[in-house]
């Protein structure tokens, strides 16, 4: 089974992430940031990952450290669960619409962290959630999962829809990339022989 549990404790946050890459989309989310929980739910449901997140942080200051550190810890959990990457598809992509909004996410388990994030949010907040924290979440994920990630919101008016389509597309692209390819069961998907 491709499962992992990772704990991250700093002076700013205490986070535990439990992940099953071959799950059914079950989730138990308590990040302390309600909108982040809503977005993590999208990743779990659309990625078909079993995901538990428990976090406490210095949200009395703002949500930045918690959101970023959940991204970091999730990235570490994915890297741990995926192991040596033998047999994975490696690449994943998804387009997801929601009413007027359309987003595209493309991922590569290259071992080279890189993020291209192009989301022209139409407002600064969704409820109390600062949409600038979205890029911090994904930057933390990318740097600790060791992936190249391209995120593009192609159109949208509603900032909630922009966020939601990004997270849904991310879950679906991640699912595709970590899917095991039975034709390549014991091989690394790279001409270098390593990722």
Curated annotation (Swiss-Prot):
Broad class of the protein's primary localization: cytoplasm
EC id: 4.2.1.19
Single GO cellular component term: cytoplasm
Tagged with keyword Transcription: no
Pathway per the UniProt entry: Amino-acid biosynthesis; L-histidine biosynthesis; L-histidine from 5-phospho-alpha-D-ribose 1-diphosphate: step 6/9
GO biological process: L-histidine biosynthetic process
Single GO MF descriptor: imidazoleglycerol-phosphate dehydratase activity
UniProt keyword list: Amino-acid biosynthesis, Cytoplasm, Histidine biosynthesis, Lyase
Catalytic activity: D-erythro-1-(imidazol-4-yl)glycerol 3-phosphate = 3-(imidazol-4-yl)-2-oxopropyl phosphate + H2O
Database matches in Pfam families: IGPD
Top class in the EC scheme: lyase
Origin: domain of life: Bacteria
Subcellular location: Cytoplasm
NCBIfam families: PRK00951.1-1, PRK00951.1-5, PRK00951.2-1, PRK00951.2-4
Family membership: Belongs to the imidazoleglycerol-phosphate dehydratase family.
Protein name: Imidazoleglycerol-phosphate dehydratase
Organism (species): Cupriavidus pinatubonensis (strain JMP 134 / LMG 1197) (Cupriavidus necator (strain JMP 134))
Organism classification: Bacteria, Pseudomonadati, Pseudomonadota, Betaproteobacteria, Burkholderiales
């Amino acid at each position: 089974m491709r499962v992992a549990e990772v704990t991250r404790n700093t002076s700013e946050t205490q986070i535990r992430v439990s992940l099953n890459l071959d799950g059914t989309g079950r989730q138990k989310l308590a990040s302390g940031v309600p909108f982040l929980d809503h977005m993590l739910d999208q990743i779990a449901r659309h990625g078909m990952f079993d995901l538990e997140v428990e976090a406490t942080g210095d949200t009395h200051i703002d949500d930045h450290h918690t959101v970023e550190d959940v991204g970091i810890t999730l990235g570490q959990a994915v890297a741990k669960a995926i192991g040596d990457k033998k047999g994975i598809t490696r690449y994943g992509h998804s387009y997801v619409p929601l009413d007027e909004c359309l987003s595209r996410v493309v991922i590569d388990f290259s071992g080279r962290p890189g993020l291209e994030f192009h989301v022209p949010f139409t407002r600064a907040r969704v409820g109390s959630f600062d949409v600038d924290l979205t890029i911090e979440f994904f930057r933390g994920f990318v740097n600790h999962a060791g992936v190249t990630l391209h995120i593009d919101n192609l159109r949208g008016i509603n900032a909630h829809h922009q966020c939601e389509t990004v997270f849904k597309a991310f879950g679906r692209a991640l699912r595709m990339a970590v899917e095991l390819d039975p034709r390549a069961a014991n091989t690394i998907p790279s001409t270098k022989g390593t990722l």
